Amino acid sequence: MDNRIKMSGKKRPNTRAVKQQLFLNCGRVDMYSMEEYAKCKLELHHDPPFRYSHHTIYEESYLLSADSHRELHYLEQHNIDEYNYRMEIIRENKRILERKRG
């Protein structure tokens, strides 16, 4: 069963919805480690302070699947050349989308 907030389109969930879902997933924060809370928050709402790495392009993270996002974080830490190559592809795809919309 997937307890994540359903994201329609590209709009990020609002803070209240994220807090409610965090409470359902993690319970009271003082009952759990902050690491578990931060990991859950990262999955629900891509906020930079809760990231494990300096993954910089988070504004298009809604375009990526959860698996792709995890793989990018892994590549950022272990294979920076492949990470840079993939991020350049993501940037180029974003530019193409913006041109089509605009």
Indicate residue ranges for each PLM-predicted region:
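A detector for short metal-coordination/catalytic motifs
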Residues: 58-60, 66-102
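Compositionally biased, intrinsically disordered low-complexity segments
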Residues: 8, 21, 39, 92-93, ...
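Histidine-centered nuclease catalytic patch
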Residues: 31-63, 72, 76, 83
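Short, charged surface segments at domain edges that flank catalytic/cofactor-binding sites
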Residues: 1-34, 53-55
